[in-house]
Amino acid sequence: MTTQLQPVVTVTPPLPTRRNAELLLLGFAAVITVAALAIVEANQERNFRWYLAGYGLIFWSLFASAHLAIRRFAPYTDPLLLPIVALLNGLGLVMIHRLDLVDNDVTGHHHTSAAQQMLWTLVGVAAFVLVMTVLKDHRQLARYGYISGLTGLVFLAIPAPLPEQNGAKIWIRFPGFSIQPAEFSKILLLIFFAAVLVAKRSLFTSAGKHLIGMTLPRPRDLAPLLAAWVISVSVMVFEKDLGTSLLLYASFLVVVYLATQRLSWVIIGLVLFTAGSTIAYFTFEHIRVRMQVWWDPFTNLDVGGYQIVQSLFSFATGGIFGTGLGNGQPDAIPAASTDFIIAVFGEELGLVGLAALLMLYTIVIVRGLRTAIATRDSFGKLLAAGLASTLAIQLFIVSGGVTTLIPLTGLTTPWMSYGGSSLLANYVLLAILARISHSARHPLRSRPHNTSPIAVASTEVIERV
């Protein structure tokens, strides 16, 4: 009897998709959002307008559609990413609505910032679903690395010749709305950084001289770092956008360090940025004013210190447990719904509530870094780590700015601050991170291989003749 050999296919034990848990957490996020809205209405209007419950239903329906897209196109996505972002977005909508109520009482006009933000949430979730549908594999982005980099640079350069608005050249005005192209540049440039670092890794890891225990790069290999430095300083000087400059440069240094594991790149980068910032401080008036406001906002109230002072007063008023949703005085803070929304939460939720919000961001960042660790390809590792690090850096810049830990930069808080460009760009960022997460958690199917004939041969009894 002849035994036919069968190929053996080994399959990695599948992880549970956890899609039902994600749906349950989305419901929980919707309940918290509606409850926060009810508290604001009770404290501000002394009643609850029941039609607002419809907004809660619309809100949950939006994210349920995003959940269905994940279930259909990326079922192994980390189940915590979407619910946490939904909760952050929902709380941001509640606070923007709360600020609308204050503005209505003060000015007598009907403000609709919350409705506009809800519309941008719809656009952002639609973009999330579109990316999840179209982008079947995150490695496809590596093919367009140079195109992404060029497009990102164009987006950065477009506002430079346009008129200055609110102290910076970062906006492009259209009839009825405006966009901030730098929000999309950070994603495009991260794709470019990751693609180049994977394709040209030898350029960044070539050994140079040794100094104080560090391996320095060769002088001719410093061109990419110098290019990033020139771009960052140019944005800071010519567009007066310190936040984007700091965010892009710090993200580049993080990705370079993760790709090379050489501290020398980071140290050289920090030295270059410090030198450029110092020269800019003594050369350009707006940089000098920004630093003076940071050093002593109380004596520079007329040139930007007033809003920082009011932010500090809000944190002091909130204390440990806050004044309660709807019981604060956010109208005292200029740009409360954009640059200073963290200060508003700090006043009404206190240190405990603000720490909880920061913990939600921390979970998203940590899950993004875990995705980077679990991803099997180098491009996915660098891109996921870069996206997660960008969120962490942006959160640090925003939080540090409103507490005077660092100079105020004008960046917005992801998913919470008012602004369509920021919301849309961060949902695209989330979709890419979710796609990489699906790839990292998806069971790995190995190639079939033939087993040894000895292993499958049956035992035969041979009679002695």
Curated annotation (Swiss-Prot):
- Family membership, please give it: Belongs to the SEDS family.
For this UniProt record, the keywords arranged alphabetically read as follows: Cell inner membrane, Cell membrane, Cell shape, Cell wall biogenesis/degradation, Glycosyltransferase, Membrane, Peptidoglycan synthesis, Transferase, Transmembrane, Transmembrane helix
Q: What is its EC number?
A: 2.4.99.28
Q: What is the lineage of its organism?
A: Bacteria, Bacillati, Actinomycetota, Actinomycetes, Mycobacteriales
Please give the start and end residues of each transmembrane region. Answer: 21-41, 50-70, 76-96, 115-135, 144-164, 179-199, 222-242, 243-263, 264-284, 308-328, 340-360, 382-402, 414-434
Protein name per the record: Peptidoglycan glycosyltransferase RodA
- Supply the InterPro entries for this chain: Cell_cycle_FtsW-rel_CS, FtsW/RodA
Which superkingdom, per the lineage? Bacteria
In which pathway does this enzyme or protein participate? Cell wall biogenesis; peptidoglycan biosynthesis
What does the record say about its membrane topology?
Multi-pass membrane protein
Q: Its function? A: Transglycosylase involved in peptidoglycan cell wall formation. Required for the regulation of cell length.
**Main localisation:** membrane
Q: Can you quote a single GO CC term?
A: cell division site
**Which GO molecular function terms does the record list?**
glycosyltransferase activity; lipid-linked peptidoglycan transporter activity
User: Which PANTHER family does the record associate with it?
Assistant: CELL CYCLE PROTEIN, PEPTIDOGLYCAN GLYCOSYLTRANSFERASE RODA
Subcellular localization is given as:
Cell inner membrane
Name the Pfam families for this protein.
FTSW_RODA_SPOVE
Keyword Nucleus belongs to the record: no
Biological process per Gene Ontology, one example term: cell division
Reaction equation(s) it catalyzes? [GlcNAc-(1->4)-Mur2Ac(oyl-L-Ala-gamma-D-Glu-L-Lys-D-Ala-D-Ala)](n)-di-trans,octa-cis-undecaprenyl diphosphate + beta-D-GlcNAc-(1->4)-Mur2Ac(oyl-L-Ala-gamma-D-Glu-L-Lys-D-Ala-D-Ala)-di-trans,octa-cis-undecaprenyl diphosphate = [GlcNAc-(1->4)-Mur2Ac(oyl-L-Ala-gamma-D-Glu-L-Lys-D-Ala-D-Ala)](n+1)-di-trans,octa-cis-undecaprenyl diphosphate + di-trans,octa-cis-undecaprenyl diphosphate + H(+)
Q: What species was this sequence derived from?
A: Mycobacterium leprae (strain TN)
